[in-house]
Amino acid sequence: MTTITRISKDKGEFYLLWLSSGEKLRVSEDILVRQRLLKGQELSDTLIEEIKKASSYDVGLQMAMNYLSYQLRSKKEIFTYLKEKEIVPEDRVKIVQRLEELRLLDDAIFSESYVRTAMRTSDKGPRNVAQQLKQKGISEEDIQHGLTFYTLDEQLNVATATAEKAMKRYRTKSFKDALQKMRLHLMQKGFTNEIIDLALESLAFEKDEEQEQQALDKEGERLWRANQRFDFSKKVQKVKQSLFQKGFDYDLIQQFISEKEVEHDE
């Protein structure tokens, strides 16, 4: 028979049973009282297994509730967390069911909260938000429920702010190239073409001729250096082609090339 050599307080409502075998059992106060566990008490192997089984559920439930105290979680996240904590599968199921009964776990509410937070703190469109919810194990029905709070007006607000910020990053590009990259950027963020069109229309970006000229000069010089190994004619051809592909106007490109031709003839 194994004897309880010591009982000490652990975190929360838990206690540690120190056994003569050298093993330690973590039990809840409820189990301690229910089983009338005392120092010096002898425990059969059968009783030890019963205590372990009951403790797995209690410990797992307490861990899950503590995990939920920081923020809302999806059912999948709770299952994953309990698995990492080595809670046995049958207890994971019971724990999740108990949390649902206590209304501490609800994927529909999680979806709604996640969408509201994403709208307020991120630059992600509804498609990306939906994908993230799917990765968290949220059902399609609950995803669609959450997305009802991401209204068209909210999508437009987020897309517009994202586009405005992106345009500042692309100011060294041609106006045409900047618009294309910004559109692609918004698509990658998960916005629909309809919202992207409305966002760009509301911002009413206009070409700054001076900025366009500066962007062309900078890119043109970079390309000119990059093609130094070619003869003049081939270099002109490659630079013109690259600048055109980057969205610069033909007249500006031709002006840049003309200046290079003058330098070459001197």
UniProtKB/Swiss-Prot annotation:
Superkingdom, according to UniProt?
A: Bacteria
* A cellular-component GO term for this protein: cytoplasm
Q: Cross-referenced InterPro entries, in alphabetical order?
A: RecX_HTH_1st, RecX_HTH_2nd, RecX_HTH_3rd, Regulatory_RecX, WH-like_DNA-bd_sf
Q: Does the keyword Cytoplasm apply?
A: yes
Which cysteines bridge via disulfide bonds? Answer: none
Please cite one Gene Ontology biological process associated with this protein. regulation of DNA repair
Keywords annotated in UniProt: Cytoplasm
Where is the protein situated, by its record's location annotation?
A: Cytoplasm
- Which Pfam families does this chain map to? RecX_HTH1, RecX_HTH2, RecX_HTH3
Q: HAMAP family from the xrefs?
A: RecX
Function noted in UniProt: Modulates RecA activity.
Q: Into which family does the record put it? A: Belongs to the RecX family.
Protein name in UniProt: Regulatory protein RecX
